[in-house]
Amino acid sequence: MRRNSERPVRITEVCLRDGSHVMKHQFTEEQVRFVTRALDEAGMHYIEVSHGDGLGGSTLQYGKSLVNEMKLIEAAVDECKQAQIAVLLIPGIGTIHELKQAANIGAKLVRVATHVTEADVSAQHIQFARELGMEVCGFLMMAHSASVEKLVEQAKLMESYGAEAVYVTDSAGALLPHEVRERIRALRQSLNIEIGFHGHNNLSVAVANTITAIEEGATRIDGSVRCLGAGAGNAQTEVLLAVLDRMGYKLDIDLYKMMDVAEEVVAPLLPVPQEIQKGSLVMGYAGVYSSFLLHAERAAQRFNVDARDILIELGKRKVVGGQEDMILDVAAELAKIKMEV
């Protein structure tokens, strides 16, 4: 089929980073080795490994990791024969010190992530990553919450800092296909670097959104095997690969092996099956950061309020990633209102 780029499509598997939210950041080294080895043997291009909130995310606010993420990254690098290991870094959570550590133990790609209106805070990290010899992408989170014009403006900043690609990152799983098309098309017409798309499946359109992004020229896409990612997960990698194969894309990833990875390697790790439940559905509907789900559910239980009310209120306040402390504040306020009624 016709698409607006001649570059090959490359996939980053995010189940060992985005999926860390689902696992409450309790991945073991053995699990990371097992999953990485299977993905590598299937031909996966990139495998992202780090705390769910990126390098340096193991804190009381974001959730403590069971195993130091550098050990997990090192283990993943050790298992790879052809895939490259990627990491996520959110300025303000991760630092250039942690980025240097990750590079020294073999991480080859870093995605530097900021809120969609705050690309300026990524300059130092992008430039430093280039100095380290890493492949560097910008990652504009909560892309649904800004105008197309603002998105283009911020993407151009990341390009000027040295990013080799910029992702439209649908952190809330709130974008619909026509909105993805509009954003990717605008970036393709404005940038001279690659464009990526990272979706979440909270409204059950992650695969459709990813296909739309590819049609408009995105060449870097994300997936999570068995939807092992925050909220309702991301575009389900093995499903996405099957769709792409039907459409004529040859990505040199073994579809049968990826089905086996999903069924035999990743599925047994899931605390519960990844499906669109009311919490993740509300996040997509309200436009709330997908990693907020478990935090909101815990706060709801603590304050005896409905998690959906918490998420809707967070959406109204346009709370962004990094403001997890607001979840408890909102829950407490809702509980107080409930008592007064």
Swiss-Prot record:
Residues binding Mn(2+), per UniProt: 18, 198, 200
Gene Ontology biological process terms, A to Z: catabolic process; L-leucine biosynthetic process
Family annotation (CDD domains): DRE_TIM_HOA
Catalysed reactions, as listed in the record: (S)-4-hydroxy-2-oxopentanoate = acetaldehyde + pyruvate
Pfam family for this entry, one: HMGL-like
Binding site for substrate: 17-18, 171, 198, 289
GO MF term list: 2-isopropylmalate synthase activity; 4-hydroxy-2-oxovalerate aldolase activity; manganese ion binding
Site positions (Transition state stabilizer): 17
Pyruvate carboxyltransferase domain: residues covered: 9-259
HAMAP family xref list: HOA
This protein's name: 4-hydroxy-2-oxovalerate aldolase
Organism from which the protein derives: Bacillus thuringiensis (strain Al Hakam)
